[in-house]
Amino acid sequence: MTNIRKSHPLFKIINDSFIDLPTPSSISSWWNFGSLLGVCLATQILTGLFLAMHYTSDTDTAFHSVTHICRDVNYGWILRYLHANGASMFFICLFLHVGRGIYYGSYTFSETWNIGIILLFAVMATAFMGYVLP
């Protein structure tokens, strides 16, 4: 009798993706930070879009729009806090991801490492332009 997770078409996809994933035995929890970066980035984009629907950048009404988001919009307070704390979590994951690369010697792959450094500088410049300057 065959195992259903290896013979059923839907279960076979799940089995190959999660259970019998061909990864080395030396993989550790440090390798999860790339996935966490994707989750944090998706959260930032979604909460940022929803917050931008109610925010006005006019200097006279900006504070009023933030209080409107927190008080009048359904779950607006949680969107604001998710967006603020998600940015911190994104950078924590980003620095841990770079630290993992330094620890495991990924800088020897110069092309991949240089692209990563360019992305790091682009993310830091975007954060500076979007959060520090306004």
Swiss-Prot record:
Transmembrane segments annotated in the record for this chain: 33-53, 77-98, 113-133
Mitochondrion as UniProt keyword: yes
Example GO BP: mitochondrial electron transport, ubiquinol to cytochrome c
Phylogenetic classification of the source organism: Eukaryota, Metazoa, Chordata, Craniata, Vertebrata
Miscellaneous comment in the UniProt entry for this protein: Heme 1 (or BL or b562) is low-potential and absorbs at about 562 nm, and heme 2 (or BH or b566) is high-potential and absorbs at about 566 nm.
Function: Component of the ubiquinol-cytochrome c reductase complex (complex III or cytochrome b-c1 complex) that is part of the mitochondrial respiratory chain. The b-c1 complex mediates electron transfer from ubiquinol to cytochrome c. Contributes to the generation of a proton gradient across the mitochondrial membrane that is then used for ATP synthesis.
Subcellular locations according to the entry: Mitochondrion inner membrane
Organism: Rhinolophus hipposideros
One Pfam family hit: Cytochrome_B
Keywords: Electron transport, Heme, Iron, Membrane, Metal-binding, Mitochondrion, Mitochondrion inner membrane, Respiratory chain, Transmembrane, Transmembrane helix, Transport, Ubiquinone
Protein name as annotated: Cytochrome b
SUPFAM superfamilies, alphabetized: Transmembrane di-heme cytochromes
An example Gene Ontology CC term for this record: mitochondrial inner membrane
Major place of residence: mitochondrion
Annotated cofactor note: Binds 2 heme b groups non-covalently.
UniProt GO MF annotations: metal ion binding; ubiquinol-cytochrome-c reductase activity
Residues at which heme b b562 binds: H83
PROSITE patterns: CYTB_NTER
Residues annotated to bind heme b b566: H97
Summary of subunit composition and partner proteins: The cytochrome bc1 complex contains 11 subunits: 3 respiratory subunits (MT-CYB, CYC1 and UQCRFS1), 2 core proteins (UQCRC1 and UQCRC2) and 6 low-molecular weight proteins (UQCRH/QCR6, UQCRB/QCR7, UQCRQ/QCR8, UQCR10/QCR9, UQCR11/QCR10 and a cleavage product of UQCRFS1). This cytochrome bc1 complex then forms a dimer.
Membrane topology: Multi-pass membrane protein
CDD domains: Cytochrome_b_N
Family per similarity comment: Belongs to the cytochrome b family.
UniProt xrefs under InterPro entries: Cyt_b/b6_N (IPR005797), Cytb/b6-like_sf (IPR027387), Cytochrome_b_N_euk/bac (IPR048259), Di-haem_cyt_TM (IPR016174)
Cofactor: heme b
